[in-house]
UniProtKB/Swiss-Prot annotation:
Homodimer. The tRNA molecule binds across the dimer. It catalyses: tRNA(Ser) + L-serine + ATP = L-seryl-tRNA(Ser) + AMP + diphosphate + H(+); tRNA(Sec) + L-serine + ATP = L-seryl-tRNA(Sec) + AMP + diphosphate + H(+). Consists of two distinct domains, a catalytic core and a N-terminal extension that is involved in tRNA binding. It is found in: Cytoplasm. It comes from Chlorobium luteolum (strain DSM 273 / BCRC 81028 / 2530). L-serine binds at residues 235-237, 289, 389. Pfam families: Seryl_tRNA_N, tRNA-synt_2b. This is Serine--tRNA ligase.
Length: 430
């Protein structure tokens, strides 16, 4: 959520941000917000003046009654009228405050100056050079779905029977490989990258979704348990960030770094017509998430650190990838700056998103009321929050299966995963 003071002082800058994000349709909301803010401040001033008058007259009434020097009836009648006027103003202020909060929750985050201006994903910039690893595939490459079925390690048909399309089942060594991938990433982040592991709930309340920005803008993308008013998490970012909702953090404790595994659930409403084969688009997948809480002046260095930690996982797995700096028209509404990390699919002949690393600045912290005090004399400040996928296993599994396939129709296991799997290859006879 943006600071209303920032919006009031920089309305043209906010309007430019909406234009750069291709959200010109939100400009009437901005104009309405500015109108409400002006009216609200006028009403607050008038209410304060009337309350001050009521306090003064109340003292005069008390003095008249005490001294008996005159009648207080007219003053009492006047103050009753003032009280009714104050009640009306308070009611109007309450309505304005609710509408203001509704608009503030709907407006996107500011953009860091380093974010390139663009309309669509086609305008994203390749950051640095793509990273390659030697995986000679001198034969006709099979896709992950074909190989997974042939080896008996993936079962999308039974997943569809049990739940519906987009809910995969990992079988045998496929399940073992998935678990190995999760454990390897958690170990690398906690033992080498300095994160504290947490294992969060997979269901959250609406306040948690509001805190991280999924509510109300992306309400149609989450699974909702209406009877209990709980929601299946789209990412561990939601419960982990909200661990510190409504808290005053110790400045000495910052930065705080968490790594969390969770299953992730996404309705993917509006994805009809997109490629939905295999792991390319699923409703449930596994992911290890990195979340950081930092001082404002340290957040952009922390973003580069998170990106580096995600890249380190791919380098250890020897999976080819590239990094994109997202443009203004493709970046999420909550992020001020975002990198996407994409892995190469030999069968699809294209890059697939496996990680997003974002700096939200104080956008989430304002919504979730997460603050810190630099010292005992300072005013509380909002922390900056960041997160990064470290990483999503579904797209990693695509790349591993396709890059490590053998001429015989099997799959070699990446060397760093062998201690976790207990086997180095998945053969057609498994």
């Amino acid at each position: 959520m943006l600071d209303i003071n920032y919006i009031r002082q920089n309305p043209e800058e906010v309007a430019t941000m909406l234009h750069d994000r291709q959200l010109q349709g939100d400009e009437p909301k901005l104009q309405r917000l500015l109108f409400i803010d002006t009216e609200r401040r006028t009403l607050v001033q008038k209410t304060d003046e009337l309350k001050a008058l009521r306090n003064t007259r109340s003292k005069e009434i008390a003095e008249l009654k005490k001294s008996g020097s005159g009648s207080a009836d007219q003053l009492i009648a006047d103050m009753q009228a003032v009280g009714e006027e104050i009640a009306g103003l308070d009611s109007r202020l309450s309505a304005l405050n609710m509408e203001m909060e509704e608009i503030l929750l709907a407006l996107p985050n500011r953009l860091d100056p380093s974010v390139p201006v663009g309309r669509t994903a086609e305008d994203n910039l390749v950051f640095g050079e793509p990273v390659h690893f030697p995986h000679p595939l001198e034969f006709d490459v099979k896709n992950h779905l074909e190989l997974g079925k042939a080896l008996g390690i993936l079962d999308f048909e039974r997943g569809a029977k049990v739940t519906g399309a987009g809910f995969p089942v990992y079988v045998g060594k496929g399940a073992r490989l998935e678990r190995a991938l999760i454990n390897f990433m958690l170990d690398r982040h906690t033992e080498e990258h300095g994160y504290t592991e947490v294992f969060p709930p997979f269901l959250v309340n609406r306040d948690s979704l509001r805190g991280t920005g999924q509510w109300p803008k992306f309400a149609d993308q989450v699974y909702h348990m209406e009877e209990d008013e709980l929601y299946a998490i789209p990412t561990a970012e939601v419960p982990v960030t909200n661990l510190h909702r409504d808290e005053m953090l110790s400045a000495e404790a910052l930065p705080i770094s968490y790594a969390a595994y969770s299953a992730c659930f996404r309705r993917e409403a509006g994805s009809y017509g997109k490629d939905t084969r295999g792991f390319l688009r699923v409703h449930q997948f596994n992911k290890v998430e990195m979340v950081k809480f930092t001082r404002p002046e340290e957040s952009y260095a922390a973003l580069e650190t998170i990106r580096g930690h995600a890249e380190a996982i791919l380098c250890a797995l020897e999976i080819p990838y590239r990094v994109l700096l997202l443009c203004s028209g493709d970046i999420s509404a909550n992020a001020a700056k975002c990198y996407d990390i994409e892995v190469w699919s030999p069968a699809e002949r294209k890059y697939l998103e496996a990680s997003s690393c974002s700096n939200f600045e104080d956008y989430q912290a304002r919504r979730a009321n997460i603050r810190f005090k630099a010292d005992g004399k300072s005013k509380p400040e909002f922390v900056h929050t960041l997160n990064g996928s470290g990483l999503a296993t579904s797209r990693l599994m695509v790349s591993i299966i396709e890059h490590y396939q053998t001429l015989e129709g099997g799959i070699r296991v990446p060397e760093v995963l062998v201690p976790y799997t207990g086997f180095s290859q998945i053969s057609p006879s498994c």
